[in-house]
UniProtKB/Swiss-Prot annotation:
Keyword Cytoplasm applies: yes
Subcellular location: Chromosome; Cytoplasm
Protein name in the entry: Chromatin protein Cren7
MF-aspect GO terms: double-stranded DNA binding
Length: 64
């Protein structure tokens, strides 16, 4: 199976405090009941190897 390469997103890495450009591992919509939701991405810090979540743009494609 071939997956499309998603474009990188500029996010702040909470483990190092630096602004980095990363491609999310997974993207999903998080929406509370009765309100408009936001898209969240799962990222892996290149320096520490820890995983973190951050908001991605609303027009970003969702993954599995």
């Amino acid at each position: 199976m071939s997956q499309k390469q998603l474009p990188p997103v500029k996010v702040r890495d909470p483990t190092t405090g630096k602004e980095v450009e990363l491609t999310p591992i997974k993207v999903w919509k998080l929406s509370p009941r009765g309100r408009r939701g936001v898209k969240i991405g799962l990222f892996k810090s290149p320096e520490t190897g820890k995983y973190f979540r951050a908001k991605v743009p609303d027009d970003y494609p969702e993954t599995g």
